[in-house]
Amino acid sequence: MRILMLSSTFPYPPSRGGTEIRTFNLLRYLRHSHDITLLTQRHQDVTDADVEELKKWVSHLLIFALPAEPIPQKGMSGLFAKAGRFIESVAKATPVNVLHRYSPEIQDLVDSYVREGKCDVITCEHSVNEIYIRPEFRHRVNTVVDIHSSVCGWTRDHLEMGASPHPLRDRLSLALILKRYEKKYSSKFSSIVVTTEDDRQEFIKLRPDIKIEVIPNGVDLELFPYRSNDPGGTNLSFVGAMDASHNIDAARFFAIEILPELQKHHPDITFSIVGARPTPEVLELKNLPGVIVTGKVDSMVGYLHQSIISVIPLRTGFGIKNKTLEAMAAGLPVVGSDRALEGLAVDSNNLPLRALRANHKDEYVTAISQLLENPQLRSELSQNAREYVETEFTWESAGRRYEKVLL
């Protein structure tokens, strides 16, 4: 099968973020049996070594420049520029960031591949790539969008939890752009792939005529080996890219609202915020007692293995979370929110207990205290979680299911 894969996000190294992890690992599975041409865009953090490494995993790698960010303008000219971009976004029912990343050169190449019959299937790795798919393509070639997460659900979540940094803008965007956008682009594709049942329910309203496949993320079990022992102690960890709004909100929520309450009962408890690119809002948390902000680390799994519990206090964000699966694979007991545990059967009736659920301050305090004081419960969650990931959430399993959609 000749696959034309579109990924505006440069998918290497597969540790930079959730989009990179999912795209690379699905690509890695497919390349064993299929010819893959990858079209991607290079941002300033991509090194020549990254490019050379990615070339090893595809048949053809075509790299395009990522447009420069608009230069901020002050005063009225800046307001007019922002208003102009927003009006264009409303008129085209397409988010500003999607329009900004659009490359006419990529469009010309995609058009030529379809016109000349040079591919059997086109995959869009994340919905942002849908902009290159013309509605008529699906009559000539199989077109698949792997959505990763619903932008409507994501934005609505941020607004409901008060986590949006620009609530007025996001309310307008949700009402005037995003709902129309998801309806418009979902109609173009032969097949739709999502990562969770929640996202499937979002899109089944828009495309009741096709089967929407749920393919959850996986974990590279070699990169996240099961820890050899319970380290004990009182160090909690939260991992992720610390410039992402949902992670910023989660880190601040836990450090400011939950940790002080825990410290009343466990004075020695510490909270490590582990991940690259911490913003000023995250960095200032290290001034709080017991909070450690590491920035980028050489080994994420090393920090996980040194922690007694992984806390994942996400209040926003749709889609299955790599950080949850990775912590479970590494053998950490997990205390997470509904958003952190989305798509995972961790505390259902008649199933082994695989994580503890908490959404409010008192629930976090109770669950974490329970685990700190009960080594047997920690061991139970650790073993059950690892077995669950090994059975249900490997990239090989996800790749097999994705391949069936593409065929």
Go through each PLM region and give its residues.
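N-terminal subdomain of nucleotide-sugar transferases
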Residues: 1-65, 117
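Donor nucleotide-sugar binding/catalytic pocket of nucleotide-sugar-dependent glycosyltransferases
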Residues: 63, 142-145, 152, 171-179, ...
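Acidic donor-binding loop of glycosyltransferase active sites
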Residues: 190, 290, 305-319, 330-332
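Short hydrophobic beta-strand element within catalytic cores of glycosyltransferases
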Residues: 323-326, 333-340
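A short, well-ordered alpha-helix in the C-terminal region of glycosyltransferases
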Residues: 370, 377-391, 401
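Conserved nucleotide-sugar donor-binding subdomain of glycosyltransferases
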Residues: 76-131, 166-188
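Conserved catalytic-core segment of nucleotide-activated headgroup transferases in glycan assembly
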Residues: 214-289, 293-306
